[in-house]
Amino acid sequence: MQPLRSLCGRALVALIFACGVAGVQSEERGFPPAGATPPALRTGEIVAPPTKTFWPRGSNASLPRSSSPPQMPKGGRMAGPPARTLTPPPCEGPIEIKDTFKYINTVVSCLVFVLGIIGNSTLLRIIYKNKCMRNGPNILIASLALGDLLHIIIDIPINVYKLLAEDWPFGVEMCKLVPFIQKASVGITVLSLCALSIDRYRAVASWSRIKGIGVPKWTAVEIVLIWVVSVVLAVPEALGFDMITTDYKGNRLRICLLHPTQKTAFMQFYKTAKDWWLFSFYFCLPLAITAFFYTLMTCEMLRKKSGMQIALNDHLKQRREVAKTVFCLVLVFALCWLPLHLSRILKLTLYDQNDSNRCELLSFLLVLDYIGINMASLNSCINPIALYLVSKRFKNCFKSCLCCWCQSFEEKQSLEEKQSCLKFKANDHGYDNFRSSNKYSSS
């Protein structure tokens, strides 16, 4: 009996040790937790996609916790009774991403890369070449497309490589640059959508503001502010992300992640509150601003509908089309980023490391998170497609530009530009007559 008990004891110790090693390895190559993730965000979850994960509740650590014994105080005795910690039961198997999701993520990323470069570069070319497309809303859309293009060119290829190679060979500089560009791109998207919603309300509320050709000074100031604020808000990503080195199965792996031990109190607070900050500013803010100003715009249009003349019908139709286009862009943004933010919030609110059913929840959240990553990446290429489907003017310009890319854009669009410019002038003349008649009638 004694040899049998000794053998069972050794087997039990070996099993516990194996589970501990598996947990440490899983944590070392784990899924970026609350503080190490954004929505790209356009964010750290795409910088270091996981193959295995271990999520401690309320922790932002991605490194194994220290297993050293507690320090002995002076005198050789502990200050109190030894603390007893309840270790949660280990999962039956590692929570990991299967190869199927890797292939799906790679295919989606390649599609986003190709469609995003073609769509956003074509959109920028249309607005740059076509003089009648150079107005306030379209310049904001061009700013949004430029931010998406930077994210697509720099971030997506590196993210695909990181997922397949499970190593970070690009150095510390790229480890800081990739999440910085990704977060700046998301900030440009969010603030541009907010500016577009406000611009549409101003266009409807002030009927004397006729849409013309060229970039208004206020729009130029808005674009500069959007880029400056987006870059400033992305600076904590560059400061917080770092590259660590760890040994795994005899191999030396380099991992890029939001470091679990930050140097300053501000960065420690940022790491702790990052998911809630991303959800509130980068997701809820554009939706709230769009809902508020579009409600005001609808009330304004219903109130002033009786005072419109037939001469302004074409002008109002153009404004309604632009308003519909902006609303479509905001809706696409919400649909693309909802799964990723939902997985983060569910992880923060529902996960409990002492729950016996936490392994099933981890598997669900990991799948939901990867779906969210792919959906968020899709937002970088879907805006030109949405403009093509919603706006007739953009649809005609896309057809002409894509079908005749090697030909001179001015030669193909000269007649359409002249007709559009004459149409604007006619609308302006009709509106001036309408204002003059109202002025004399009121007098």
UniProtKB/Swiss-Prot annotation:
Cysteines paired by S-S bonds: 175-256
Annotated positions of the Phosphotyrosine modification: 440
PROSITE patterns in the record: G_PROTEIN_RECEP_F1_1 (PS00237), G_PROTEIN_RECEP_F1_2 (PS50262)
GO process terms (BP): aldosterone metabolic process; calcium ion transmembrane transport; calcium-mediated signaling; canonical Wnt signaling pathway; chordate pharynx development; developmental pigmentation; endothelin receptor signaling pathway; enteric nervous system development
Glycosylation sites: 60, 354
Membrane topology qualifier: Multi-pass membrane protein
Name recorded for this polypeptide: Endothelin receptor type B
Protein's organism: Sus scrofa (Pig)
UniProt lineage: Eukaryota, Metazoa, Chordata, Craniata, Vertebrata
